[in-house]
Amino acid sequence: MPLFFYKRPGLVVYVTCGDPDLATTRAVVLAAIEAGADVIELGVPFSDPVADGPVIQRASERALKHGTCLAQVLTLAAEVRQHAQSTGLVVFSYLNPLLRMGMEKFCLVARHAGVDGVLVTDLPVEEASEYLRAMKANDLAPIFLAAPTSPDARLKRIAQASRGFVYAVSRTGVTGARQKLADDAQKLVRRLRRVTKLPVAVGFGISNAEQFAEVAKFADAVVVGSAIVETIERNRGREAAAVGEFVKKLSAVSPQP
């Protein structure tokens, strides 16, 4: 199914799969969907997550200790898809795990698992031709990161290569919840609107309902990642319930048809 935001602002929830274990991840994802998440980003743990801040780095370390791998993430996606037909599922990964599996095999397995899109955080659009061919052949949506520092020509190229939505990075640097959002985020969304009609989702640093509401004024969707992972980290034994409560607060923010 295509990625689609049924309400505005849409809510994209990121989880690191396998933290603290895959069964808990499954419960957390289903709780987030029930609480109102439109799209779930299934994070593939990686040993060198250079784009991630300390919260997601710790989550990756915990998941890798249990041996969580890309194949298990795709199995998890298939299980989630059985319970949630209309929720967007995006695999969020560094490039190396995909290359180890093989790009063609990954795309084929992802499609059969019910995955809608893929975001490869360290794959520049300029080097993505083979990846884009495999994605197109399997009707998967490639999603690229657009940064405030990107020149207009590069934003246009990113927008042209993306399907589903464009992920606008609210600021430069690594992921992680922040108390204040950069003004660059709104400017970046305006720039993207000039080159694409795709929905624009803003992420990196949104950690509470107030920030969600602020970003929702100018973005089509809001991505919440580190704050979700930190909620899991702080609520051992009740991860799914805690995430469900947090997502409900976010979902209640000024919905617009």
Where are these regions (language model features)?
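Glycine-rich phosphate-binding active-site loops on the catalytic face of alpha/beta enzymes
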Residues: A37-S47, A113-L119, P124, A168-G176, ...
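Alpha/beta catalytic cores of nucleotide-metabolism and tRNA/nucleoside-modifying enzymes
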Residues: R190-L198, S207-P257
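Conserved, mostly hydrophobic/aromatic
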Residues: V13, A32, I40-G43, A110, ...
